[in-house]
UniProtKB/Swiss-Prot annotation:
The gene is sucC. This is Succinate--CoA ligase [ADP-forming] subunit beta. One of its GO terms (molecular function) is ATP binding. PROSITE patterns: ATP_GRASP, SUCCINYL_COA_LIG_3. It comes from Shewanella piezotolerans (strain WP3 / JCM 13877). Pathway: Carbohydrate metabolism; tricarboxylic acid cycle; succinate from succinyl-CoA (ligase route): step 1/1. It is an enzyme of class 6 (ligase).
Length: 388
């Protein structure tokens, strides 16, 4: 689960971190009034969506004219903002953040992630602020400095100072940076973050550290113990298909290929996507129907997969353990009839009564191809997708 910038900054403020005075506004009139309340003669107005790249897409404006603020809000509220991180539909803009303008002397980067390699929270800092960190990691990885947080001792001030020295901070800035570092580390643990980015973390003209942006991702598995964070969820930013799938306890992630995938088990689902890629195909989704591949769940899975107009063929890869493959085959046939599937469906069944399940599929009068192996299934579904 992701947070909006204004939500991230409200958390920053709670932990005593330096952020700009700002207000999240629902209407153009509120945006104008917010500028008046903030005061000054320059403001920054930003569309609030979860995707990055807002500035390049016209979703951020610096202005000294309140009527320009009104026009900006009227133009964007209720519309979708398309950036390089969204699909072609973009994400809806329901709020505009109005902030005081900050004079910037230098831009830095500060972020933290849960690192699988070290099994620790790892903080990353760089002098290359305002640039996508992925670009920095690829082109100049030596400019990214790291601090690994030991879960037994927690974050230590010396780690902040070490990063600060590498960023070239002055003694005064070092103290401010240490406060930011320690606050973010505590926040990361308190609220079960999975990702945290301040890009850019700026040094103002007065020489002070300031959090100019904020991006936060929460570990979805920990939301049960984060009631305050749950209330911040904005369902309008979620992929509609992913949200629909969650209602039926289906794990679905939309991708940009043309081969729909329906599998029981996350590991098998990832392996299925890999073998589709290996044979020249492009998966259109990740979809794990879970352990109970019932007719109802399979039918909903088909509906979700086929709501993507790019899907030209569907690969169903089911391992029958507790559930018999012949029962799964009957469920697939029933679901295909109910949904009215019009693209080729390749089914690979393995496990209990697999031969009987393949026989049931072969005897159906539907456009269902029973594969003999996972390799055969991948080859057939890629061929079917290419012929469409």
């Amino acid at each position: 689960m992701n947070l909006h910038e204004y939500q991230a900054k409200s958390l920053f403020a709670e932990y005593g971190l330096p952020v700009s005075e700002g207000f999240a506004c629902d209407t153009a009139q509120e945006a104008v009034e917010a500028a008046g309340h903030i005061g000054g003669d320059m403001w920054v107005v930003k569309c609030q969506v979860h995707a990055g790249g807002r500035g390049k897409a016209g979703g951020v404006k610096v202005t000294g004219d309140k009527e320009e603020i009104r026009a900006f809000a009227e133009n964007w509220l209720g519309k979708n903002l398309v950036t390089y991180q969204t699909d072609e539909k973009g994400q809806p803009v329901a709020k505009i953040l109005v902030e005081s303008c900050t004079d910037i002397a230098n831009e830095l980067y500060l972020g933290a992630v849960v690192d699988r390699a070290t099994q620790r929270v790892v903080f990353m800092a760089s002098t290359e602020g305002g640039v996508e960190i992925e670009t920095v990691a690829e082109e100049t990885p030596e400019l990214i400095h790291k601090a690994i947080i030991d879960p037994l001792t927690g974050p230590q001030p010396y780690q902040a100072r070490d990063l600060g020295f590498k960023l070239g901070l002055t003694p005064t800035q070092m103290k401010q940076f240490t406060k930011v570092f320690m606050g973010l580390a505590k926040m990361f643990e308190d609220h079960d973050f999975a990702l945290l980015e301040i890009n850019p973390l700026v040094i103002t003209d007065e020489g002070n550290i300031h959090c100019l942006d904020g991006k936060i991702g929460i570990d979805g598995n920990a939301l049960f113990r984060q009631p305050k964070i749950r209330e911040m969820h904005d369902p309008s930013q979620d992929d509609a298909r992913e949200a629909h799938a969650a209602k039926f306890e289906l794990n679905y992630v939309a991708l940009d290929g043309n081969v729909g995938c329906m599998v029981n088990g996350a590991g098998l689902a990832m392996g299925t996507m890999d073998i589709v890629n290996l044979h020249g195909g492009k998966p259109a989704n990740f979809l794990d129907v879970g352990g109970g591949a019932t007719k109802e769940r399979v039918a909903e899975a088909f509906k979700i997969i086929l709501s993507d107009s790019n899907v030209k063929a569907v690969l169903v890869n089911i391992f029958g353990g507790i559930v018999r493959c012949d029962m799964i085959a009957e469920g697939i046939i029933g679901a295909v009839k109910e949904v009215g599937v019009e693209v080729p469906v390749v089914v690979r069944l393995e496990g209990t009564n697999a031969d009987l399940g393949r026989e049931v599929l072969a005897n159906s009068d539907l456009d269902i191809i029973a594969a003999t192996s996972l390799t055969d299934a991948a080859e057939q579904v890629v061929k079917a997708a290419e012929s469409k």
